[in-house]
């Protein structure tokens, strides 16, 4: 295994997931110092510790050292093993926090991954499971990750602060990834959505749908928003409601937006009408930003392009989010790869905001964990 000399060193608690995921894929150890060192409550938070435990479950032979105060972490990655795993996520963050990283790692396991995650399915901070199902899964399919065993299923919903949700994610393994050419975002052809309500009146979901449609109907007739009212044990432990919207384009691109109500006992109560209208506006804003991948999944697309065969991949993105910009810096540190970035100013055709064309040659990453049959 690599020695401490090869390890990368970082300071601070930001982008912890990016660093650990890229460390696992590249096999380079990472040392992170000064994790909230000056905070009143220093060190790793519960949800970060839970994430490290999850990495430990899906890998074989990882070495994790955390000091007494939790302010320094040394991670020496093992091999991605996969198999059947269960994990109780921290209710401080959504399941999306954990799932985003699993989507990056799952195709490179030794055995196909089948994981049950329990916790908060929809919150105001992380991408909800609904949005990841509607946008990230089709993106992975573009890279050739597909099959009957590729699914993400919501068994129970759970809202903060109590949680109680449950999702099942299964993903096949791939030896190599296909290069992609996603340069034509296409035009919006349909909008689909999911209005959910748990432990409140089912009427809430209908009120959300009506208000969201009142805005979106001005632009396109093909809108269908499903209502999902889970009852009993399937509704988790806390009341709440929310909406996720996904716009599909003629070239198979998915752009998403979502909103959830305030957690029980925190902040003012949100009117379902306001939530529906605001979510519809967020979707219009995402469509304005445009690109072939929505802002939630920019970093996932760039990672899979990096790990592809030694061939050119291109993707047209909207404005890069700060998270994606930092991710590009990390890709350079871990994989020594740099993207060619061309700005494409919006023309006269009312195509929305300025776009960025990202081009790279894959490093020809071969799944070392997967044994040859």
Swiss-Prot record:
The keyword Nuclease does not apply. Keywords: Nucleus, Ribosome biogenesis. GO terms for molecular function: RNA endonuclease activity. GO terms for biological process: endonucleolytic cleavage in 5'-ETS of tricistronic rRNA transcript (SSU-rRNA, 5.8S rRNA, LSU-rRNA); endonucleolytic cleavage in ITS1 to separate SSU-rRNA from 5.8S rRNA and LSU-rRNA from tricistronic rRNA transcript (SSU-rRNA, 5.8S rRNA, LSU-rRNA); endonucleolytic cleavage of tricistronic rRNA transcript (SSU-rRNA, 5.8S rRNA, LSU-rRNA); ribosomal small subunit biogenesis. Coiled coil: none annotated. It is found in: Nucleus, Nucleolus. GO terms for cellular component: nucleolus; nucleoplasm; small-subunit processome. It comes from the Eukaryota. Gene3D superfamilies: RNA 3'-terminal phosphate cyclase domain, RNA 3'-terminal phosphate cyclase, insert domain. It holds the Pfam family RTC_insert. The keyword Cell cycle does not apply. InterPro entries: RNA3'-term_phos_cycl_insert, RNA3'_phos_cyclase_dom, RNA3'_phos_cyclase_dom_sf, RNA3'_term_phos_cyc, RNA3'_term_phos_cyc_type_2, RNA3'_term_phos_cycl-like_CS, RNA3'P_cycl/enolpyr_Trfase_a/b, RPTC_insert. PANTHER family: RNA 3' TERMINAL PHOSPHATE CYCLASE, RNA 3'-TERMINAL PHOSPHATE CYCLASE-LIKE PROTEIN. Part of the small subunit (SSU) processome, composed of more than 70 proteins and the RNA chaperone small nucleolar RNA (snoRNA) U3. Interacts with BMS1. As part of the small subunit (SSU) processome, it plays a role in 40S-ribosomal-subunit biogenesis in the early pre-rRNA processing steps at sites A0, A1 and A2 that are required for proper maturation of the 18S RNA. Activates BMS1 by promoting GDP/GTP exchange. Does not have cyclase activity. Belongs to the RNA 3'-terminal cyclase family. Type 2 subfamily. This is RNA 3'-terminal phosphate cyclase-like protein. The gene is RCL1.
């Amino acid at each position: 295994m690599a020695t401490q000399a090869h390890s990368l060193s970082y300071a601070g608690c930001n982008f912890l997931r990016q660093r650990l995921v890229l460390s696992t894929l590249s096999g380079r150890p990472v040392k992170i110092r000064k994790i909230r060192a000056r905070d009143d409550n220093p060190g790793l938070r519960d949800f970060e510790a839970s994430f490290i435990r999850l990495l430990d479950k899906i890998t074989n032979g990882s070495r994790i050292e955390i000091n007494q105060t939790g302010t320094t972490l040394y991670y020496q990655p093992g091999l991605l093993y996969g198999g059947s795993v269960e994990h109780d996520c921290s209710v401080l963050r959504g399941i999306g926090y954990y799932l985003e990283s699993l989507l990056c790692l799952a195709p490179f396991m030794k055995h196909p991954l089948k994981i049950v995650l329990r916790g908060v399915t929809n919150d105001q901070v992380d991408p909800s499971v609904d949005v990841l199902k509607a946008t990230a899964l089709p993106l992975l399919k573009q890279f050739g990750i597909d099959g009957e065993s590729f699914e993400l299923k919501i068994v129970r919903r759970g809202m903060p602060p109590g949680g109680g949700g449950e999702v099942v994610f299964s993903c096949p393994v791939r030896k190599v990834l296909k290069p992609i050419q996603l340069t034509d975002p296409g035009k919006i052809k349909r909008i689909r959505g999911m209005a959910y309500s748990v432990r409140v009146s089912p009427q809430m979901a209908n009120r959300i749908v009506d208000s969201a449609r009142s805005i979106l109907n001005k632009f396109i007739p093909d809108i269908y928003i499903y209502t999902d009212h889970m009852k009993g044990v399937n509704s988790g432990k806390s009341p709440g409601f929310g909406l996720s919207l996904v716009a599909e384009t003629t070239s198979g691109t998915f752009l998403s937006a979502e909103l959830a109500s305030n957690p029980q006992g925190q902040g003012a109560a949100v009117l379902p009408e306001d939530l529906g209208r605001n979510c519809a506006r967020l979707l219009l804003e995402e469509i304005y930003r445009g690109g072939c991948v929505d802002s939630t999944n920019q970093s996932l697309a760039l990672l899979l392009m990096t790990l592809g065969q030694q061939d050119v991949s291109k993707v047209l993105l909207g404005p890069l989010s700060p998270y994606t910009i930092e991710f590009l810096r990390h890709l350079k540190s871990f994989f020594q790869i740099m993207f060619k970035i061309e700005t494409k100013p919006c023309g006269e055709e009312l195509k929305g905001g300025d776009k960025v064309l990202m081009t790279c040659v894959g490093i020809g990453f071969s799944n070392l964990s997967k044994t040859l049959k």
